[in-house]
Amino acid sequence: MGATGDVEQPRGPGGAERGGPELGDAGAAGQLVLTNPWNIMIKHRQVQRRGRRSQMTTSFTDPAISMDLLRAVLQPSINEEIQTVFNKYMKFFQKAALNVRDNVGEEVDAEQLIQEACRSCLEQAKLLFSDGEKVIPRLTHELPGIKRGRQAEEECALRGSPIPKKRKGRPPGHILANDRAATGMVWKPKSCEPIRREGPKWDPARLNESTTFVLGSRANKALGMGGTRGRIYIKHPHLFKYAADPQDKHWLAEQHHMRATGGKMAYLLIEEDIRDLAASDDYRGCLDLKLEELKSFVLPSWMVEKMRKYMETLRTENEHRAVEAPPQT
């Protein structure tokens, strides 16, 4: 084929001819097609585009990555709606936390209890999206002071304690033991054995007008547990304690045995029980004992009578539970 000066120049995207060597002779046309920089640039751009498209395709072949990218986009909106739901129920958590602090002591961090309860709600909500057969793993390293519910049941079974069988079809999220384990509240005891309320210490006849009593807060300090108010009731649940009612607290305040506490709980313990504990192996030789903190006092007959009835009620309930308990196998 003969080369002429009518060889067509490569056109750019706008249709205009790109500048190149002047077509002065017929022999330059073939060289022009091979060395035109526009052609080289087009080829290079196609290679780059093809490579970039290939990389993007590789990134989206993993379904987990694709879904996580979508989740990351939606997460802020989801968080806002979750926060709205928690705000709706926050008043209940706040009232419960303040009630716990009033009953246990000022050392309880109400805000921490609320945060733990909210985290527990989120943990239990995961069960809504479980497969049914798969169990959601719990972060045991975050709960060093609490045994797993299954482990505690196995230990109770080895000791022969009766454990009620779980009902079939009941979701794990409604099991009280799991709920307690998820909150992380290590100050609440978890025991497989019922509290023993029997023997001479639970005989109402031991209470009379000459019996001396102490405040629970002072007993707590006397046994070296002053830093954690209410710990004595957790460590020794078998102790008899009487919750003073408003009439009792008014009398105690008038006699200067305690300060006016308003709505806070005030417990009365038997001084003899506390001194017996201090002499036991658990506290013998303990450097933190401060028995001088025990400021004992006697009570009027009308208050002693109420305490007798209360002790009798607790003891009777304990006996009924023992009778109704299934025999051990």
Swiss-Prot record:
Residues 56-147 are annotated as: Important for dimerization. The modification Phosphoserine is found at residue 161. Monomer and homodimer. A minor proportion may form homotrimers. Interacts with ZNF541. Interacts with the terminal deoxynucleotidyltransferase DNTT. Interacts with TRERF1. Identified in a histone deacetylase complex that contains DNTTIP1, HDAC1 and MIDEAS; this complex assembles into a tetramer that contains four copies of each protein chain. Component of a histone deacetylase complex containing DNTTIP1, ZNF541, HDAC1 and HDAC2. Identified in a complex with KCTD19, HDAC1, HDAC2 and ZNF541. Disulfide bonds: none annotated. The keyword Transferase does not apply. It is found in: Nucleus. Keywords: DNA-binding, Nucleus, Phosphoprotein, Transcription, Transcription regulation. A motif (Nuclear localization signal) lies at residues 164-170. Residues 1-27 are annotated as: Disordered. The N-terminal domain mediates dimerization. The C-terminal domain mediates interaction with DNA and nucleosomes. It contains a HTH motif that mediates recognition of the consensus sequence. It comes from the Eukaryota. Residues 12-22 have a biased composition (Gly residues). This is Deoxynucleotidyltransferase terminal-interacting protein 1. Increases DNTT terminal deoxynucleotidyltransferase activity (in vitro). Also acts as a transcriptional regulator, binding to the consensus sequence 5'-GNTGCATG-3' following an AT-tract. Associates with RAB20 promoter and positively regulates its transcription. Binds DNA and nucleosomes; may recruit HDAC1 complexes to nucleosomes or naked DNA. GO terms for molecular function: DNA binding; nucleosome binding. Residues 197-316 are annotated as: Important for DNA and nucleosome binding. Residues 159-173, 216-237 bind DNA. One of its GO terms (cellular component) is histone deacetylase complex. The keyword Mitochondrion does not apply. Signal peptide: none annotated. Its main location: nucleus.
